[in-house]
From Swiss-Prot:
Protein name as it appears in the record: Procathepsin L
A single GO cellular-component term on record: extracellular space
Positions annotated with a glycan in the UniProt record: N222
Propeptide: 18-117, 290-291
Tissue: Expressed by neuroendocrine chromaffin cells.
Assembly mode: Dimer of a heavy and a light chain linked by disulfide bonds. Interacts with Long isoform of CD74/Ii chain; the interaction stabilizes the conformation of mature CTSL.
UniProt feature coiled coil, ranges: none
Protein activity control: Inhibited by the propeptide produced by autocleavage. Long isoform of CD74/Ii chain stabilizes the conformation of mature CTSL by binding to its active site and serving as a chaperone to help maintain a pool of mature enzyme in endocytic compartments and extracellular space of APCs. IFNG enhances the conversion into the CTSL mature and active form. Inhibited by CST6. Inhibited by the glycopeptide antibiotic teicoplanin. Inhibited by amantadine.
PTM per Swiss-Prot/TrEMBL: During export along the endocytic pathway, pro-CTSL undergoes several proteolytic cleavages to generate the CTSL single-chain and two-chain mature forms, composed of a heavy chain linked to a light chain by disulfide bonds. Autocleavage; produces the single-chain CTSL after cleavage of the propeptide. The cleavage can be intermolecular.
Natural source organism: Bos taurus (Bovine)
Swiss-Prot/TrEMBL catalytic activity: Specificity close to that of papain. As compared to cathepsin B, cathepsin L exhibits higher activity toward protein substrates, but has little activity on Z-Arg-Arg-NHMec, and no peptidyl-dipeptidase activity
Broad class of where this protein is predominantly found: other
Length: 334
């Protein structure tokens, strides 16, 4: 990655005062609480309800504008409904610069005519969508996703790999568990360690309070290093087409992303430099009949299958590196 970004997480803060609530939304609120198993103290419930109502209004207004053709994607209420955008960014995202070892540089194949669309989920390269929970471990999920794809390419077998192994054991390489990390640091740990355990043998706990429990006999993957991709969408496209799923970092801190549901995500406020979330590009394509318009990246997130488009997001492609999708792309070598 160049420049490097450190994906991290901060503490959750809760404000106290709450404005007047809309009684017409009582049934919707109680249904949302039941769906997401929320239980609050008396003082907190009013505040959370007020935050939820504000988010619902933002979502409803956006979708009204979507129906008028002003946006290319829909939003929907989800598990983040009772979080302010500031809390959402603090819990799920955040970054700081960090020096780290550089990988090999990706050399774009010159004589390869890449296809107009690619979807590695249809080729067996991608495990089901996972959920990082209230832990800033997006970097680990992005890293395992890329390695799962490369191991499938090499062996023909798709094995879910252990994010918890990375969370617990890669601090020496510069990662900080639930407080953040880098995909390249994860790839370096796997090389240094000589392997990574399977998800089945080392299940995810969404916490970083345990000591490293790597078991060599349960190792299901290894890598020999990693490759950094030049900061261009054309280079990323060639890598996705010829290599497989690619780890990337994006600016995911906007309310529009917090409540993304479907369509091609584009937010004019999205930064190509202020990256705060690690995800996995598993393909690209276009909507309609014109392959030069409505282009998108297929991105696997780690917020569970209920978020977004069954856990995925279509992100605008060839729109000046929108949200920084090509700024910090890399993959492991096996």
């Amino acid at each position: 990655m160049n420049p490097s970004f450190f994906l991290t997480v901060l503490c959750l803060g809760v404000a106290s005062a709450a404005p007047k609530l809309d009684p017409n939304l009582d049934a919707h609120w109680h249904q949302w609480k039941a769906t997401h198993r929320r239980l609050y103290g008396m003082n907190e419930e009013e505040w959370r309800r007020a935050v939820w109502e504000k988010n619902k209004k933002i979502i409803d207004l956006h979708n009204q504008e979507y129906s008028e053709g002003k946006h290319g994607f829909r939003m929907a209420m989800n598990a983040f409904g009772d979080m302010t955008n500031e809390e959402f960014r603090q819990v799920m995202n955040g970054f700081q610069n960090q020096k780290h070892k550089k990988g090999k540089l990706f050399h774009e194949p010159l004589l390869v005519d890449v296809p107009k669309s690619v979807d590695w989920t249809k080729k067996g390269y991608v495990t089901p969508v996972k959920n990082q929970g209230q832990c800033g471990s997006c970097w680990a999920f992005s890293a395992t996703g890329a390695l799962e794809g490369q191991m499938f390419r090499k062996t023909g077998k798709l094995v879910s790999l252990s994010e918890q192994n990375l969370v617990d054991c890669s601090r020496a390489q510069g990662n900080q568990g639930c407080n953040g990390g880098l995909m390249d640091n994860a790839f370096q740990y796997i090389k240094d360690n000589g392997g990574l355990d399977s998800e089945e043998s080392y299940p995810y706990l969404a916490t970083d309070t345990n000591s490293c429990n790597y078991k060599p006999e349960c190792s299901a993957a290894n890598d020999t290093g990693f490759v950094d991709i030049p900061q261009r969408e054309k280079a990323l496209m060639k890598a996705v087409a010829t290599v497989g799923p690619i780890s990337v970092a994006i600016d995911a801190g906007h309310t529009s992303f917090q409540f993304y549901k479907s369509g091609i995500y584009y937010d004019p406020d999205c930064s190509s430099k202020d990256l705060d979330h690690g995800v996995l590009v598993v393909g690209y394509g276009f909507e309609g009949t014109d392959s030069n318009n409505n282009k998108f990246w297929i991105v696997k997130n780690s917020w569970g299958p209920e978020w977004g488009w069954n856990g995925y997001v279509k992100m605008a492609k060839d729109q000046n590196n929108h949200c920084g999708i090509a700024t910090a792309a890399s993959y492991p070598t096996v």
